[in-house]
A protein has these predicted regions:
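N-terminal, positively charged/glycine-rich alpha-helical extensions of SAM-dependent methyltransferases
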Residues: 2-39
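A short glycine-rich, Lys/Arg-flanked "PGG" loop and its adjoining helix->strand segment in the class I
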Residues: 153-168
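A short SAM/SAH-binding and catalytic strip from SAM-dependent methyltransferases
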Residues: 137-151
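A short acidic, Gly/Pro-enriched loop at the edge of an enzyme's catalytic core
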Residues: 126-138
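Conserved class I S-adenosyl-L-methionine
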Residues: 170-179
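Conserved alpha-helix/loop element of class I SAM-dependent methyltransferases that forms part
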Residues: 49-66
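Class I SAM-dependent methyltransferase SAM/SAH-binding core
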Residues: 71, 77-127
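Class I SAM-dependent methyltransferase Rossmann-like catalytic core
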Residues: 34-51
C-alpha cells in the first residue's frame, strides 16, 4: 500500500503546532460519505477527546513512554502524537487506514521528532502488519467507540499481539450508560 495523497480538497487544517495548512482527511467526499469524526472536523471540531485534553494528559502520564517503542492507532490530525513525541519515546509508529492521515503524521513526526525513528503505516488497527511483541505501549484514543463489537475485539487482539510482556494498551473511550 502506498502513502501518496492528492491535495485537491478545499478543506484544510493546521498541524499540531498551528503551522501550515494540511488537507483534512476525506475532504474530497460529500457529507453523506464522510466518517463521523471527519464531518465534525470539517465543521470546526478538530479534537475529539471524550474526556478532553486533561484525560489525554492523565492517560499518557500513566503510560511509561520515555525510551519505549510506541504504536498509536488512528492518530488523526496528530494532537496526541505530538504529546507522545514530547515524552521522548525510543520509537513511534502510527497506524491509520486513511492515506491523508498517514501523510499528516509522517510530516508531523519528521518535523517535530527528527532524532526519533518514526513511521506511519497505511493499515487498519485490526491488522497493522507490524511485528508481534514489538511495542512497549499501544495508544488508542476514542476509536473503539466507532467500531462494531467484532471490530473492537479485533483491534484489542491486535494491540495485545503487538505488546511485549509488561507492555501497556492505553485507551480512553466514550462510556454511554442507559438512564
Amino acid at each position: 500500500m502506498g502513502t501518496q495523497t492528492t491535495n485537491t480538497a478545499s478543506q484544510s487544517t493546521t498541524n499540531a503546532q498551528g503551522n501550515g495548512s494540511l488537507p483534512l482527511p476525506q475532504s474530497d467526499r460529500d457529507v453523506e460519505h464522510l466518517q463521523g469524526h471527519w464531518l465534525l472536523a470539517r465543521i470546526g471540531k478538530r479534537v475529539l477527546r471524550p474526556g478532553g485534553k486533561k484525560l489525554t494528559g492523565r492517560m499518557l502520564a500513566k503510560t511509561e513512554l520515555e525510551g519505549k517503542d510506541v504504536v498509536e492507532f488512528a492518530p488523526g490530525l496528530g494532537r496526541t502524537t505530538q504529546l507522545i513525541l514530547e515524552r521522548k519515546p525510543k520509537s513511534y509508529r502510527g497506524v491509520d487506514r486513511d492515506p491523508q492521515v498517514v501523510d499528516i503524521i509522517t510530516k508531523l513526526t519528521a518535523e517535530n521528532a527528527p532524532s526519533i525513528p518514526t513511521s506511519c503505516a497505511l493499515r487498519d488497527a485490526a491488522d497493522t502488519g507490524l511485528e508481534s511483541e514489538s511495542a512497549d505501549a499501544v495508544i488508542g484514543e476514542a476509536m473503539l467507540t466507532m467500531q462494531t463489537e467484532r471490530g473492537k475485539r479485533a483491534i484489542i487482539a491486535e494491540a495485545y499481539r503487538l505488546l511485549r510482556a509488561g507492555g501497556t494498551y492505553s485507551i480512553h473511550e466514550l462510556g454511554l450508560q442507559p438512564d
